[in-house]
């Protein structure tokens, strides 16, 4: 979605909300309305705002420093600049997980020290709260200068960056109370700790209907069959690893289980370094040969990039050779827009002139995936023995991938006061995408002023939400072990041959009817 946090609040002069569907005017995504930000255009003055606070529990400390300055640009222009710096400490609102409390109560010592589980806080073994936001820097500018009485050149843009980090769920080692119920889910992390049901006397897997006890998964490093299949769990509460089998696995260099190296389990920490940049340049004014036509022609380019990281996790298929921190890659969306908009009025015999707005837009989109480090997507030697591949929690992208699409749109919008009490609007927009074809959307809206204090409003509109270049065209395939066989899994292009076999895919569409009554706001 749109990241409104990239625009500092001091850069905003006013926010307008169009609550009716607006795909017929603004295109994809404007199904339920539009937010229009009017930027500050002061050519003088300085404003400084600082904020500091924290939560009652003592965490969540945050500060913000923001400043805005306006200055003249020549004799008939302005340059307005806003900067903001913010830091937000994460919060933790977790309680002790039932499975961890159960393990502690039943004598599984490794989880008693919560710092062994959660590297972020030693208070609870599960991170739950708002993420950390560090080095949140935002810069924004807005400018314009008059060339003559009817023409103005303008430009605005921004650069924002920040690092965000949060936590995932706890990876359970030995299970919970359900261990005592045959056939029930143990709650152990699959692909890391959860082993097959095993014979408690041999540690070897039993058939699904042959009983057995839960176990902790064991891998055979040379791919042979010299190791047991799992360390049986039993004892008090059904969560105690059998000490003799655990010693046997530990003593054999060819056998490996993550209970040896990470006996308390773990909580991955996931985040990203985000950058958002955009610039728009345009010219607006009135045509000077008596037509009364106002115009606005512009070009805009923007990009958003995220480079991900994940730490305090593993690639289980690599066994003891796994790193604990990974760089799984990144992604970037880049868009370029060319707009031409025109407005004029004509006398059509109504109570007011008929306002005619029309225009065209050409959009280019590009989406790029950047490959992660090799360990973040590797299929290690233990993958065929039930250990999951890729960095646990967020697997890395295996290769650089790019996708693109473009679209061309035309629209017309008519509005007039038909009588002194009735206002009507009609709009239609056609947009043609290189990836899936064209779509036409319309809007009919009106206002009836019943009294000075009561108005009846209504709108009938159609809308759509087109897939982005990344959603429509990206390929990201990883290899996993499913039921003992190597299987490719991932995301395929929306219009690939395989996707076409599954269903006929079109952009999401809508029909919106919005009747309402309104009264003037009392100020």
What are these regions (language model features)?
Residues 9-12, 40, 74-76, 146-150, ...:
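Outer-membrane beta-barrel channels and translocator barrels
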């Amino acid at each position: 979605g749109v990241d409104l946090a990239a625009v500092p609040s001091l850069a905003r002069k006013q926010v307008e909300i169009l609550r009716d569907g607006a795909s017929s005017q603004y295109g994809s995504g404007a199904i339920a309305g539009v937010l229009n930000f009017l930027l500050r255009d002061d050519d003088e003055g300085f404003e400084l705002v600082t904020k500091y606070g924290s939560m009652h529990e003592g965490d969540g400390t945050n500060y913000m420093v923001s400043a805005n300055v306006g200055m003249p640009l020549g004799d008939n222009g302005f340059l307005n600049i806003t900067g903001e710096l913010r830091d937000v400490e994460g919060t933790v609102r977790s309680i002790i997980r039932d499975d961890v409390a159960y393990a502690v109560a039943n004598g599984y010592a490794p989880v008693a020290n919560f710092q062994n589980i959660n590297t972020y806080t030693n208070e609870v073994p599960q991170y739950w709260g708002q993420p950390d936001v560090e080095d949140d820097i935002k810069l924004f500018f807005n400018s314009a200068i008059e060339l003559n009485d009817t023409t103005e050149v303008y430009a605005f843009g921004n650069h924002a960056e920040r690092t965000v980090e949060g936590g995932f769920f706890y990876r359970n080692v030995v299970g919970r109370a359900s261990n005592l119920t045959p056939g029930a889910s143990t709650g152990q992390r699959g692909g890391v700790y959860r082993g097959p049901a095993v014979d408690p006397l041999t540690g070897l897997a039993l058939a699904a209907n042959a009983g057995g006890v839960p176990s902790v998964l064991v891998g055979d490093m040379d791919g042979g069959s010299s190791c047991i299949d799992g360390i049986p769990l039993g004892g008090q509460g059904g969560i105690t690893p059998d000490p003799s089998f655990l010693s046997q696995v530990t003593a054999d260099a060819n056998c490996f289980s993550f209970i040896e190296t990470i006996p308390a389990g773990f909580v991955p920490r996931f985040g990203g370094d985000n950058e958002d940049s955009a610039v728009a340049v345009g010219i607006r004014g009135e045509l000077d040969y008596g037509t009364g036509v106002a115009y606005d022609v512009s070009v805009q380019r923007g990009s958003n990039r995220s480079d991900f990281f994940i730490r305090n996790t593993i690639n289980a298929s690599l066994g003891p050779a796994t790193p604990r921190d990974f760089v799984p890659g990144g992604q970037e969306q880049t868009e370029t827009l060319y707009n031409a908009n025109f407005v004029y009025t004509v006398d059509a015999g109504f109570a007011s002139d008929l306002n005619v707005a029309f225009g065209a837009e050409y959009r280019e989109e590009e989406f790029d995936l950047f490959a992660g480090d090799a360990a973040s997507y590797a299929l290690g030697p233990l993958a065929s023995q039930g250990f999951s591949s890729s960095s646990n929690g967020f697997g890395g992208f295996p290769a650089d991938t790019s996708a693109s699409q473009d679209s061309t749109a035309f629209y017309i919008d008519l509005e007039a006061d038909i009588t002194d009490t009735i206002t009507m609007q009609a709009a239609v927009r056609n947009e043609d995408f290189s990836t899936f074809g064209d779509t036409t959307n319309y809007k009919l809206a009106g206002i009836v002023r019943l009294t000075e204090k009561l108005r009846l409003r209504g709108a009938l509109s159609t809308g759509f939400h087109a897939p982005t270049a990344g959603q429509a065209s990206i390929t990201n395939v990883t290899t996993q072990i499913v039921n003992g066989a190597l299987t490719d899994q991932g995301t395929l292009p929306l219009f690939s041959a395989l996707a076409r076999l599954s269903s006929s895919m079109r952009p999401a569409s809508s029909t919106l009817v919005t009747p309402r009554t309104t009264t003037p706001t009392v100020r």
